[in-house]
């Protein structure tokens, strides 16, 4: 248990930041899953509309991963690995017909 005022405040700040970071990570996971789902949808029914869905969801996922790295929620290598994994999946999906 914290004994002085500054230590108590640091506990509150750490908890607040933990919740914010958790939210970022959750959103990154959600957008990644959405991108992969859109890729599967494109595989089943390749058309321009589904291709646009894949590219827009990919851009959103990349943007959020970059923001998470910028705010030190994710390590830069972790962010790069996530982007690489998503991009490889999308690339194989869009090139395979």
Curated annotation (Swiss-Prot):
GO biological process entries: translation
Keyword Cytoplasm: no
Cellular compartments per GO CC: small ribosomal subunit
Keyword Ribonucleoprotein carried by entry: yes
InterPro entries cross-referenced by the UniProt entry: Ribosomal_bS20, Ribosomal_bS20_sf
GO molecular function, one term: small ribosomal subunit rRNA binding
Pfam families assigned: Ribosomal_S20p
Keywords: Ribonucleoprotein, Ribosomal protein, RNA-binding, rRNA-binding
Family classification: Belongs to the bacterial ribosomal protein bS20 family.
Functional note: Binds directly to 16S ribosomal RNA.
Protein's name in the database: Small ribosomal subunit protein bS20
Organism of this sequence: Prochlorococcus marinus (strain MIT 9301)
């Amino acid at each position: 248990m914290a004994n002085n005022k500054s230590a108590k405040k640091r506990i509150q700040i750490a908890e607040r930041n933990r919740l914010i970071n958790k939210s970022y990570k959750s959103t990154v996971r959600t957008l990644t899953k959405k991108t992969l789902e859109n890729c599967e949808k494109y595989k089943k029914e390749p058309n321009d509309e589904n291709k646009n869905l894949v590219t827009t969801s990919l851009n959103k996922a990349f943007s959020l991963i970059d923001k998470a790295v910028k705010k030190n929620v994710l390590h830069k290598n972790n962010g790069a690995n996530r982007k690489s994994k998503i991009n490889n999946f999308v690339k194989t999906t869009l090139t395979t017909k």
